[in-house]
Amino acid sequence: MSERLKGNILVTGTNRGIGLELVKQLAEKTGEESHIYACCREPEGVRAEALRDLATQYPGKITIIKLDTSDEDSISGAVRAVSKQIGAAGLNLLINNAAINKPALPGSLAATGKKDMMEVYETNVAGPFLLVKMFLPLLQRAAERDTPEKDKGDKMSCRRSAIINISTLISSIEKCPETFHMAQMYPYRTSKAALNMLTRCQAEEFKTHNILVTSIHPGWVRTEMGGEEAPLTTQDSVVGMLSVMSSLSNKDSGMLLDWQGNMIPW
């Protein structure tokens, strides 16, 4: 279903894991009219080698952007770089994927300090907040352009103008009694709960602009953060998420869904 996604798409945290796979599948499954802006902290670093290799496979389709989501100046620089290329078309889809987790699993109360809480919050919540705030003019520009969706009852879509915040099942307050035994992860789960509120607030604020805002749980994925015991590959998770993104509409804005499209309670 990801072939339904198109336009200018920006993804954060793309040097590895889910972010890298998002860029890969978007490059494979979107048309020539699409362009992917792949953001990471150190585009020239060793950890971004796979991303650089991917960009060379799709010349003119992928642009790597230097971005540290915990640094406001870095975000401003990324906005300027993307704006120069996008022009009047605007930004159709912003995927806030970059996130960190501290301390190491299981992230118990005893092992967690104030510094851990603040660093995780800065990247996982303040970062997406600032990204949306600074990229909003480009998102609005895309939303205001004439598109086939504009004349339909469902005016919102990821093809028009949308923000996707990558969240997690363990952000759910209602599900906490079921998930707490899996991993306590105090900083991570509380930061993602805050990200969910950010999703809900922005969905309310931006609905008059026809900008969709949805949180998506990618599943328990076999990544550096998810660990080797995770049942899902990045490929399967991203296939599912892109299918969900391609079908989102007004009714899904402000919601928390999983990679298969199932609703998760707050």
What feature does the model see in each segment?
Residues 12, 89-101, 124, 164-167, ...:
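Rossmann-fold scaffold of SDR-type NAD(P)-dependent oxidoreductases
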Residues 12-15, 19-25:
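N-terminal Rossmann NAD(P)H-binding glycine-rich loop of SDR-like oxidoreductase domains
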Residues 27-48:
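Conserved glycine-rich Rossmann-like NAD(P)H-binding loop of the short-chain dehydrogenase/reductase
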Residues 45, 67-80:
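The beta1-alpha1 cofactor-binding region of Rossmann-like NAD(H)/NADP(H)-dependent oxidoreductases
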Residues 54-73:
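Rossmann-fold cofactor-recognition segment
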Residues 59-63, 81-96, 102-105, 250:
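A glycine-rich helix->loop->beta "capping" turn
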Residues 100-102, 107-121, 126, 136-207:
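Catalytic loop of short-chain dehydrogenase/reductase
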Residues 208, 215-218, 223, 227-266:
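C-terminal helical subdomain
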